Amino acid sequence: MLEQIRGPADLQHLSTHQLRELAAEIREFLIHKVAATGGHLGPNLGVVELTLALHRVFDSPHDPIIFDTGHQAYVHKMLTGRAHEFESLRKKGGLSGYPSRSESEHDWVESSHASAALSYADGLAKAFELSGHRNRHVVAVVGDGALTGGMCWEALNNIAASGRPVIIVVNDNGRSYAPTIGGVADHLATLRLQPAYEQALQRGRDALRALPLVGKFAYRVMHSVKAGIKDSLSPQLLFTDLGLKYVGPVDGHDERAVEAALRHARGFGRPVIVHVVTRKGMGYAPAEDDEADQMHSCGVIDPITGQATKVAGPGWTATFSDALIGYARKRRDIVAITAAMPGPTGLTPFGQQFPDRLFDVGIAEQHAMTSAAGLAMGGMHPVVAIYSTFLNRAFDQIMMDVALHRLPVTMVLDRAGITGSDGASHNGMWDLSILGVVPGMRVAAPRDAARLREELGEALDVDDGPTALRFPKGDVGEDIPAIERRGSGLSGVDVLALPASGCNHDVLLIGVGAFAPMALAVARRLADQGIGVTVVDPRWVLPVSDSILELAARHKLVVTCEDNGVNGGVGSAVSAALRRAELDVPCRDVGLPQRFYEHASRGELLADLALTDQDIARRITGWVAALGSGVAEAEIREHLD
């Protein structure tokens, strides 16, 4: 049946029995396709009936359907003509794991970061009204914990006051990655409002107000009594007191019930909350039985057992997790904060060991950072573990609430650099540029597991300002020993390789963090061409160590190699430091060009960007040749470009 669905119009004449058959087929399709490619399985298994109902009630794309945390949009993609592309899900040149404007007119936004859909919906509703398109509805589907984000409540405040026809579907599965935390999660409860009930209620209000002399007074008295009763009985007042209509809760796996609720909501002609209760991982036993996160996201798995087909090696996240627990056993002041991601950021074991020292604040990165500031003011040393890409959301709090007060808060940035298959929104290529402008910020980029443990310990010993550690997704690899360390403390840099015997000190190659192994491979290639290279790991990459400047003064060329955007990264910082020190040594930066990157594997993206050891060695060879020929600096720059 799924093969016959080319678009939402093909759903309109299906019977209840056919819809049930289609839902079962969609789940089977999802399990086998996502098992083969990896992706967000649990969230999509939970929204099958909801998505069918949405596309039967609303006229997409005329009525925009916006998915917050867009990882729950797989079924939407299938129903809008893209089921045949799922073999390529999250692969280079294939189907994105999130809504994509370039794929379909049904995808209005590139949504993947949480809590933004309601603001998009508010803006679209305003635009439609100003354009005279009063017969268009805007639907925002929020869930997977998105309502724990403050941006949702800012948008709700505006939507409620507008009176515009925005339908807000709350996909209440009680979870983000792990179970949803906080008062909002506790507050999603019951009230079933039907249009007929609302119409009768309004007629009663009008009749009461019309009574001679006492009408308005009687209405106020009765309204106060009704409000008091509702306050004691109806948790949904969280929404209705904002001026939003409320429908629900509705069984999210009863397609007809969801469809009826959506049709009622559409008929109100004003902002409405439709509360839909779903089960993450619905219909797939391995997901339903996964207490950690209902298989929120998975790699390639066996579709029968749900088990990974490839055993991963030691990972960066697990290494951090073990190290933090080790330090926390020795120091009671160490606490940890997560923004709804204890599992993905490695904090679940910490919470099991120290349940009173782990704080899950929900999808609320801004609050996480300022709460960390408060903890630090109170004598704790908070560790905020967060994906690099989500750090962007808390910049003001880092600057004004943490750094301004010189508070000892440590930020651990997982998934730094190119992450790959999750696409543009998840590449952690901005953190060095962002943190580089924060006064007093110190940033480390460990090259291996041993350095991660060491640099985490150093960060925890800092008591006069914020620190950050960044590391990529995936396996951590073998430890890389240093030949020597120049300098001490946070200023100490590790020398990993020296020029071969008989070679000049031509190039100082600075390998930042996980790019250190590639820097060593580049040095070996250059040595074969008679180019002498010193490879250093700066360890604490920001601010630039005096030891780096001392080494730079002994070389003809400095090259930085980093897994970050080149604008404002380590290369920019080293160039600026060389100028301040009045060192006339040219510096070239190798990193990520400043643009958004489509989904592909990390290796594929790095190859496309000429960020392999072979490509980098070729570029450095050209730079050294240009320097050796005595060409003017401007001509060298032109040659390099």
Swiss-Prot record:
EC class of the enzyme, as a word: transferase
MF terms (GO), sorted A to Z: 1-deoxy-D-xylulose-5-phosphate synthase activity; magnesium ion binding; thiamine pyrophosphate binding
Co-factor(s): Mg(2+); thiamine diphosphate
SMART domains: Transket_pyr
Alphabetical list of CDD domains matching this protein: TPP_DXS (cd02007), TPP_PYR_DXS_TK_like (cd07033)
Keyword Transferase carried by entry: yes
EC number(s) stated in the UniProt entry for this protein: 2.2.1.7
Cofactor note: Binds 1 Mg(2+) ion per subunit. Binds 1 thiamine pyrophosphate per subunit.
Catalytic activity reported: D-glyceraldehyde 3-phosphate + pyruvate + H(+) = 1-deoxy-D-xylulose 5-phosphate + CO2
Pathway(s): Metabolic intermediate biosynthesis; 1-deoxy-D-xylulose 5-phosphate biosynthesis; 1-deoxy-D-xylulose 5-phosphate from D-glyceraldehyde 3-phosphate and pyruvate: step 1/1
UniProt entry keywords in alphabetical sequence: Isoprene biosynthesis, Magnesium, Metal-binding, Thiamine biosynthesis, Thiamine pyrophosphate, Transferase
The keyword Ribonucleoprotein appears for this protein: no
Residues binding thiamine diphosphate: 71, 112-114, 145-146, 173, 284, 365
Biological processes per GO annotation: 1-deoxy-D-xylulose 5-phosphate biosynthetic process; isopentenyl diphosphate biosynthetic process, methylerythritol 4-phosphate pathway; terpenoid biosynthetic process; thiamine biosynthetic process
GO cellular component, one term: cytosol
One matching Pfam family: Transket_pyr
Binding site for Mg(2+): 144, 173
NCBIfam families, alphabetized: dxs (TIGR00204), PRK05444.2-2 (NF003933)
Function: Catalyzes the acyloin condensation reaction between C atoms 2 and 3 of pyruvate and glyceraldehyde 3-phosphate to yield 1-deoxy-D-xylulose-5-phosphate (DXP).
Subunit structure: Homodimer.
Family note: Belongs to the transketolase family. DXPS subfamily.
Protein's name according to its UniProt entry: 1-deoxy-D-xylulose-5-phosphate synthase
